[in-house]
């Protein structure tokens, strides 16, 4: 199969990119066959690429009709499938890879251009993670070390990062002589989104080591970790860097800055960032409403929620969590109930346990404990520890011993190894002079082999 220069310049090839329907595509395909370009790699690769976006089954049929297709054509179709169909057609990408492996031609073998797309596909969903690990072994088997170029290495880093395997991702990253910006960003984002201990500290350390100029994605990871750590000064530095280097204050950078300033107690700075953003998505509104909620500005949070809707945006599941929470922190019970009821009735969003948790907190904080308890009994999902802990707090605040005891017993059932729950129960019993129950609680701790963490002081 050849690829002469004439095959690249024929006028019909310019029409391929303009095809918008399967009918147009078939007409161009017929013309390619008629003028004798059906055995040339370049026009076939363009045809495969576009047909995979218009009609994937037609693209696969084209490949089947090609006698002895080259690995370049296989790579083209694999890459296009992964780029245009995300996880929905991952099985087809791996099916094509299997065809490469089973080819009898000595010229059809996987190369350094085969694997990056497949590693990307492997990271889409947990069911494909084992395939990605197998691909790693194939890289070592089929590619010479000299062909382990930075694109393959970067794809490996991305795969393990997407799987949450930060140790493996970091080990592979350290072997890359000169990581490009995309690879740096991949690892930074993986650490920033991880719940592992010290992952945010790793983001700060990695950022200081960067050998390339950071962009907006780099700064989002840095600002997010600064927010989690309360690193206000470094977060402000990142904001200044964005402004001085004329980077875009897009939705991602803006949302991370709003979260940073809100968590550090600088709500006016957060609002200034929000107001200065030229484009705001639902996540931006959610971050700002969350900040207002935490600082007790529930009415302002509701106004922002209404503004979101008036702008033509559709609230998502997280929007209702932060907005009902804003109502809860400000005692706006009726408004919170109205917003909760609109979730399913207006927007078709089925409430989850976190929404019911906000509702229980809303009712409990206002002293409507009977309604909160009734809500727990009727909710269609199983209450979690966070919900029971909220109900416990409200019961203690309003002096309802019986409901507090119920909440704690449920907490013990969910977190029997948490010594704090036993201490709380013991304190409740001690507060009403039920010393026999205090002793029983301590015996229960011994039976479950739960040790109370000793108190410490940081004062010298």
Swiss-Prot record:
Keywords for the protein's UniProt record, in alphabetical order: Repeat
GO MF terms, alphabetically ordered: RNA binding
PANTHER family in the cross-refs: DYW DOMAIN-CONTAINING PROTEIN, PENTATRICOPEPTIDE REPEAT-CONTAINING PROTEIN
Species name: Arabidopsis thaliana (Mouse-ear cress)
Name of this protein: Pentatricopeptide repeat-containing protein At5g43790
Any Pfam family matching the protein: PPR
Homology family: Belongs to the PPR family. PCMP-E subfamily.
InterPro entries: E_motif (IPR046848), Pentatricopeptide_rpt (IPR002885), PPR_At4g14850-like_plant (IPR046960), TPR-like_helical_dom_sf (IPR011990)
Residue numbers spanned by region Type E motif: 387-460
Record Gene3D superfamilies: Tetratricopeptide repeat domain (1.25.40.10)
Gene Ontology terms: biological process: RNA modification
Spans of repeat PPR: 70-107, 111-142, 149-179, 180-214, 215-249, 250-280, 281-315, 316-351, 352-382
Organism phylogeny: Eukaryota, Viridiplantae, Streptophyta, Embryophyta, Tracheophyta
NCBIfam families per record: PPR
